[in-house]
A protein has these predicted regions:
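Short cysteine clusters
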Residues: 13, 17-20, 218, 273-276
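Secreted/processed peptides and extracellular or luminal domains of membrane proteins
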Residues: 19, 23-26, 224, 279-282
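Short catalytic/ligand-binding loop motif for oxyanion handling, primarily in non-cytosolic enzymes
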Residues: 27-28, 62-63, 90-92, 119-122, ...
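Structured loop/turn residues at beta-strand edges in well-structured enzyme cores
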Residues: 48, 106, 271-274
Length: 300
């Protein structure tokens, strides 16, 4: 049951992190207008089960007035709200509180701040640390997101992962991470990746929405376009087994997706996301409606 929508307020970001799911950066296009924000939230409300709306990106604080108005509208509609940011704007404690106080006044439920070396170079006195301190002083609900460079850990001593390489660090191999972070990591035969380890494709609880109208079940994997079909109808009619990408993934993971469409591929991959992302990138021109936008795959 769908309970949350995450608006990718913009793909634009002040940073260009190697691990970014959606290939954000300073030149990235795709920003909501105010009218689109209102329409997306109205469509979410029509479903009847959506309880929360997050604003993220990219970097939503780059479009500060739009972000605040989106949060205000969502709160007035009864949604719990959250914001995800890298806190580039927290240049001092005073400035951090200045930026955050309007969110406190609007009553957001969560502020998630990226605090890691990808965003801030591992500095102790990073903008993220300043923002977290400021949020706590204001009494704003907050938490940090910390992703590390992928690295090899010893395999699990028992259970289904016994003897298999374990990749630590928290980075998920989608988006720019596939092109920047897989070098040197151990790989396994593609046939081993028989399930999607992260997303509930059969019954998604949250989706990401972008300004192009794409409704992401996973970054770059869309169930349709909300500017063409309303969300209430889309999810009323949704059957994952009939989706050309989700169907095979449910039947047998990325390995099944590869076998289903019989395209040329490598013999080994780091993990299921690595295989799935590259398989989807190969299938872009075949299923442009469901694999979008192209920029999430590092393409124009």
């Amino acid at each position: 049951m769908l309970t949350g929508v995450h608006l990718l307020l913009s793909y634009k970001c002040d940073s260009e992190c190697d691990h970014c799911f959606v290939y954000s950066g300073p030149q990235a296009k795709g920003t909501f207008t105010l009218a689109q924000v209102k329409e997306a939230l109205n469509q979410a409300a029509e479903i009847g089960t959506v309880k929360s709306a997050y604003f993220e990106g990219g970097e939503p604080f780059l479009f500060y007035p739009l972000m605040l108005e989106g949060v205000r509208i969502a709160r007035n509609m009864g949604f719990k709200t959250g914001v995800v940011t890298n806190a580039y704007w927290a240049t001092s404690q005073d400035d951090a509180q200045l930026w955050l106080r309007p969110l406190l006044d609007l009553g957001i439920s969560d502020l998630s701040i990226s605090d890691d070396a990808f965003h801030h170079g591992g500095k102790d006195a990073s903008p993220a640390r300043r923002a977290l301190e400021a949020a706590r002083k204001l009494g704003l609900p907050c938490g940090s997101i910390s992703i590390e460079q992928p690295s090899l850990e010893e395999g699990a001593s028992d259970g289904p992962s016994r003897g298999k390489p374990v990749i630590a660090g928290g980075a998920v191999l989608r988006g720019r991470a596939v092109d920047k972070l897989v070098a040197g990591l151990p790989r396994r035969p593609w046939q081993e990746f028989t399930e999607c380890p992260h997303e509930d494709l059969a019954d998604p609880a949250r989706v990401h929405l972008d300004s192009y109208g794409n409704v992401h079940l996973c970054q770059g994997l869309s169930t349709g376009n909300m500017w063409q079909v309303r969300l209430s109808q889309m999810f009323g009619d949704y059957a994952a087994e009939r989706h050309p990408i989700c169907g095979p993934l449910l039947q047998g993971g990325p390995a099944r997706l590869v076998a289903e469409y019989e395209f040329k591929h490598e013999d080994e991959y780091v993990d299921a996301c690595h295989l799935c992302y590259l398989a989807r990138r190969t299938l872009l021109d075949r299923f442009p409606q469901y694999l979008a936008p192209r920029q999430v795959y590092g393409l124009e």
